[in-house]
């Protein structure tokens, strides 16, 4: 999550810096992407998602759910992926491509276990924030992609609700996904966004495409049309 820098002189903000900040906001909106943690007013960083650090886990390698809830503990096993710096990286430019994604163990909103591990089939992880306008725009496209039979039959899709805030629109995320008619499995991220940080998600919606053995094929963030989703998956997964 990017922290805003405010310049001050004689108790007033610099007009030039206000203009720069306004331009930055416009560019983010045009890009169709919400910055990770955009629902918060406080800046934060992810020290564990620099690509060279190990995601920490409890001594027994597991986490226990406290029952039903909008936030659930997440255990990640493996190295965190580097933070995605571009919304749509050129093929081969994402340092995470070709590396093993960490295995995520967590729970759904009801407290039922959910494990995101290799299944032998390609998997698409979709990181969503309930307050994100781009996520709200993208979910209907993903559903259209599925219902129009353009999505590869072998592709498994899992939604991960993250960056949740009870002071933001569409709270709670569990009801939001019901209202949006989300048809796939769901993992609820922790309040610390452990799942998102482990996968190096830099914006919402964040998409992480994995091969059947858990290898990262491609990542992207921001809105995508059905045709763009088709092209993106086909380029990363030729057999799709």
Where are these regions (language model features)?
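Short, internal strand/loop/helix patches
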Residues: 174-213
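Conserved helix-turn-beta segment immediately C-terminal to the redox Cys motif
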Residues: 121-122, 137-161, 226-228, 234-235
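N-terminal targeting signals for export/organelle localization
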Residues: 1-100
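Thiol-based oxidoreductase modules, predominantly thioredoxin-like and allied folds used
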Residues: 152-170, 182-191
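Short active-site neighborhood of thiol/selenol oxidoreductases, capturing the structured segment around
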Residues: 113-136, 142
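Solvent-exposed loop/turn segments at secondary-structure junctions
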Residues: 129-134, 163-167, 191-194, 202, ...
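A short beta-strand-turn-helix
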Residues: 95-96, 103-123
């Amino acid at each position: 999550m990017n922290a805003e820098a405010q310049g001050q002189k004689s108790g007033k903000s610099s007009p030039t810096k206000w203009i720069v900040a306004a331009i930055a906001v416009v560019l983010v909106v045009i890009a169709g992407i919400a910055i990770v943690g955009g629902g918060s007013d406080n800046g934060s960083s992810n020290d564990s998602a620099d690509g060279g650090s190990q995601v920490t886990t409890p001594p027994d390698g597991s986490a226990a759910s406290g029952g039903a809830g909008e936030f659930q503990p997440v255990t990640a096993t493996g190295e965190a992926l580097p933070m995605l710096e571009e919304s749509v990286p050129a093929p081969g430019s994402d340092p995470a491509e070709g590396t093993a994604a960490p295995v995520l163990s967590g729970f759904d909103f009801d407290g039922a276990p959910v494990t995101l591990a290799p299944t032998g089939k390609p998997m698409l992880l979709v990181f969503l924030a309930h307050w994100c306008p781009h996520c709200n725009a993208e979910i209907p496209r993903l559903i259209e992609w599925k219902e129009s039979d353009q999505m590869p039959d072998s592709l498994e899709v899992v939604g991960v609700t993250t960056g949740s805030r009870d002071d933001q629109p569409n709270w709670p995320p569990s009801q939001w996904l019901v209202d949006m008619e989300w048809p796939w499995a769901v993992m609820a991220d922790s309040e610390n966004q452990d799942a998102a940080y482990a996968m190096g998600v830099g914006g919402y919606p964040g998409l992480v495409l994995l091969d059947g053995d858990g290898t990262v094929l491609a990542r992207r963030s921001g809105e995508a049309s059905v045709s763009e989703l088709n092209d993106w998956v086909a380029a990363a997964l030729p057999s799709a």
